[in-house]
A protein has these predicted regions:
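Short hydrophobic/aromatic patches at helix-to-coil boundaries
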Residues: 141-145
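Small/aliphatic-rich secondary-structure junction motif
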Residues: 3-53, 77-86
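A short acidic, glycine-rich active-site loop
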Residues: 54-69
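Aromatic/hydrophobic pocket-lining residues that form π-stacking "cages" and hydrophobic walls in ligand
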Residues: 22, 74, 99, 133
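Short, hinge-like loop/turn segments at secondary-structure boundaries
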Residues: 50-54, 103-106, 129-130
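Short, well-ordered secondary-structure micro-motifs
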Residues: 18, 45-48, 97-100, 123-125
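Glycine-rich, Arg-bearing micro-motifs that act as flexible, cationic patches
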Residues: 110-135
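Structural beta-alpha unit
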Residues: 76-111
């Protein structure tokens, strides 16, 4: 059925549940897995006077450290589930775009992700990343709650 799952996470509790569901499904299907976390471009996160206090190089260091932490957690989950899993940090992309492009580029046939993550009020303004992935992706998407 599915041979290569892309599991997207932002490290939130709900995303961690989606990671665990994706790994469990991959184990049953004996499918390949790739887990990613996507970080947005500095220019989309920092605006106005805040840009002076949080320069691009500091932002890059901060998001890289956070991505490493998130992916280390995925690696622990994968080890506990006894499922091999490649991990990737997708930099300087909007989450939905990074997820869809990575799934296409790596030949994935299912995307697994949480219904929502850490985005809070910004999510209400920009719309759900999960909804964007479902709308713009060309492969099935498993949304976990």
């Amino acid at each position: 059925m599915f041979q290569h799952l892309l599991i997207a996470t932002d490290g939130s509790d709900l995303a961690n549940k989606a990671v665990q569901h994706g790994l469990a499904l991959a184990k049953v299907l004996n499918a390949k897995t790739t887990a990613i976390t996507v970080t947005e471009p500095w220019s989309s996160v920092v605006a106005g006077e805040m840009a002076l206090a949080f320069p691009p190089d500091e932002y890059d260091k901060s998001v890289a450290a956070n991505a490493l932490k998130i992916l280390a957690q995925v690696e622990k989950f994968a080890e506990l589930a006894d499922v091999p899993c490649d991990t990737m940090h997708i930099k300087d992309q909007f989450p939905a775009e990074g997820i869809v492009e990575t799934a296409n580029g790596r030949g994935c046939d299912l995307i697994v992700m949480a219904s929502h993550g850490r985005r809070g009020l910004k999510r209400l303004l920009l719309g759900s990343q999960a909804q964007k992935v479902v709308t713009h992706g060309m492969i099935p998407v498993l949304i976990c709650r």
